[in-house]
């Protein structure tokens, strides 16, 4: 059984994590404390119940934020480099994969992309990322063109 949930810890309080202005104050005072509390509580609860190994937790965004600060003390949309957190689901804890350059502008080591994240999730769910599916005309389509990250 695969259950999936998505959430926004900021609810209807405004800009969510889209911090085009006042980035640092919003993150420090409003957004990161409840995120930290919720994420750590989820991992600990699953660990205590013996469910962490069978539950994959993925925390990510649809894009990163610019390395440079804009005129409104915020950061704008930026797909060049961003962070993803994996926990549980057979992932070995306490590891870092990849590294950005010194200004956070682009990957410097072990670059990966969305297709690799998809492949990693499929792998954790026991689904072969290279599995072929067929369209209505019986044309083969790869489920994913990425490779699972070596996190297991």
What is the predicted function of each stretch?
Residues 1-152:
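Ligand-binding pockets and gating/stacking loops
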